[in-house]
C-alpha cells in the first residue's frame, strides 16, 4: 500500500515541485495550504506532470481545530513535510507578530498532532539563514557550523522552530525528524507546468531577472558591487528546485526508516557559490536574452557570501544537486515565457 505524506504549503514553489517528486516516487500526497502565497491552479500543473491530482485541503495551520480535521480526514498519514510559512524577510521586519504566529504556532500544532495520529516522520524546511554570515574560514558551511543571531524575524522563526523540534524529540516524543537547511532554490520544472509565482514585485533574484528580460520590470538593480568577492557582488549557493525536491524524497525515505537517528540535519545546496553578476551573465548566455541591469547601493541585511558543504547529504541521503546552472536558468526563462503565453504576467 502506498504511504501517505502530508505536504504543508504544497501549492507553493518548493512544495509543488516536491509533491511532483513524491508522487513520481510512489507516495500518496495530501496538500494542506491556505493559498495566501500561492494559487489553486498549481494543482492543475502537478496533475499535468504526474497524471495524479493530489488531495487538497485549504487550511490555516495556526488554527489547531482546522489542522486536526486534516488528520481526522486522512488517518493514514505517515510523514509530514512542512513548507507552509510566511517567507518575506522585509515583511517580517514590519509584521513580526504575524510571522511568529504563522510560522511558529503552525509548527507546534503539527507536532502535537503527530503522536495522536501515529505520524512518525517530520521533514522541516529550514534555511541557511541560521548560519548568518559565516567567517571566511568556515566556508563552505557544514551542518555543525555555529549559528548566528538572525537578522530578521523570518530568519529567527527558522532558528526557533529548529529548537522546538529538537526539544520536543528530546522530551521523548515518539517521532523522528530531518531538518533540511536550504540554500537558494531557483528554476522551474522542465515541463514549465509549475514554477515560482511571486506576488507583485519579486523578492528573489531569478524572477526579477526573468521579469526584466521579459520587459515586465524596467531594470534589475544588483545591490552592491563593493563586497569582498571576485566581482564585488554577493555570492550564494543556487540550487535547482527539482534537485531540492528530490532531496525531500530521499529524506522522507530515511526518516520513515526505523533504524536512523531521532533527529538529523542536512545542508541542501550545490556545494559551490555563484555571484549575483554571474547569475545575470549566465542567464544571458543560456537564453540569448539581454537583461537591463545596473549596480545600486548595498541592501541592508544582505550576507556577503555563503555556500554549503553538502557532503553529508551526498553520502548519507545518496543525493546530489547536479543540474548545470545554465540549464536551471533556461528552465526559469521557459517558465516565464509560459506565464506570458497563459496571460498570467
Please identify what each model-predicted range represents.
Residues 94-97, 101, 105-112, 116, ...:
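Catalytic helix-loop patch of NAD(P)-dependent Rossmann-fold dehydrogenases
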Residues 17, 21, 113, 164, ...:
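Rossmann-fold NAD(P)-dependent oxidoreductase module
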Residues 28, 120-121, 176:
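Residues at the starts of beta-strands that form the adenosine-phosphate
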Residues 84-87, 126-127:
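Conserved NAD(P)H cofactor-binding loop of Rossmann-fold oxidoreductase domains
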Residues 59, 206-345:
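C-terminal substrate-binding subdomain of Rossmann-fold SDR/epimerase-dehydratase oxidoreductases
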Residues 66, 109-113, 243-246:
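Conserved mid-core alpha-helix of short-chain dehydrogenase/reductase
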Residues 2-79, 201:
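N-terminal Rossmann/SDR dinucleotide-binding element
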Residues 78-81, 123:
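N-terminal Rossmann-like NAD(P) cofactor-binding module of classical short-chain dehydrogenase/reductase
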